[in-house]
Amino acid sequence: MGKSKFIVSKSKILGQFQKLKQLGLEVSYSVKTFPEICQILEENTDSFFSIHMFQTLNFVKDMSRVWFIAQAWDKELLDKLFEKGIRNFVVDNEVDLETLLKYLEKKNTKVNLLLRMRLKEHTIYTGKYFVFGMYSHQINKLIPELRKNKSINKLGIHFHRKTQNTSEWNIKDEISEMLEKETLENIDLFNIGGGLPVEYKNTTDRNLPHIFEKIVEFKEWLKKEYDATTIIEPGRFIAAPSTRMETEILAIHDSNIIVDASVYNGDTDTILVPIKLLVEGEVDQGNDYVIKGCTPCSMDIFRYQVKLKNPKVGDRIVFLNAGAYCFATDFCNLPKLDVEFVD
């Protein structure tokens, strides 16, 4: 191993970002998706950064551009966050909210606050995913109360649906049914999360034009009726298309190709979601191959079936749209892949 790496296009990062800015949206990049690209966004755009863990703050220099998303915090963590200058927060339960409010009673400062709300998920995977956020009746109760709090400057709501969301974008109708008029009149910001689909072998992004139409519909309605700003929180949409994973063929036997990387240090998304990465140069007709990672795990498979034209040992296998949730594990002491920026 050692030759495999991620190759990230700076221009593609900025191009994906601009697609969202052209819709008239504020953007907060979801850092957990691929933190290494934060520097490009921070230096070249006005992006904010949605961060969930204290240690991830190292990827951003300007703390005024951070939205810190709380989970089970305490006074000690809040002290550290305030010392760093963070003043934008998202909370998803009343316990964490109460911790923040008590802390603010002793601070002579103002914060911007979003309450995370849960939306109904239409999925067959019941019990697989934790559901973040408060119920709409909690949001309807809390927002008017918080509007009176002198420690809160901008106030708003946050939600986030599943990754690769191709169908559930009827935001305006859902929000207008779930939230009372008084609630919407008392907010300044509304973060609609991410979930914009990206093209893989087993998924499509062809519905993006319709999705963008529904987002703009919501944004314009929210601004006209309630003078509130819409924020979108992309991760995969920016990171994936910007990144290719370059590997080398170590061996070929029968119809199996072994490469010098693993899903465990290059594409955990393959196991978790699961997605199937596109392969540069794959063809419609030809011999079928399995592309397997270098570990002894039988699940270490990038693609079960891909048609390639005369692959040879030493050739490159390049995976496309490979920049989302490509974090490494310590399985078999695998090294973390290098990240190379181009253009």
PLM region spans:
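A short acidic-Thr-Gly-centered motif at the start of a beta-strand
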Residues: 37-43, 222-223, 309-310
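Active-site loop/helix belt of alpha/beta enzymes
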Residues: 121-251
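A charged N-terminal "starter" segment
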Residues: 1-111, 144-148, 152-153, 184, ...
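Charged (often Lys/Glu-rich) extended helix/loop segments that serve as interaction or gating elements
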Residues: 228-343
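Active-site beta-loop-alpha junctions enriched in small/polar residues
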Residues: 30-36, 52-55, 71-73, 92-96, ...
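Residue-level marker for buried hydrophobic side chains located in beta-strands
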Residues: 49-50, 113, 190, 230
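Solvent-exposed alpha-helices and their adjacent loops that cap or buttress functional pockets
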Residues: 83, 106-107, 124, 191, ...
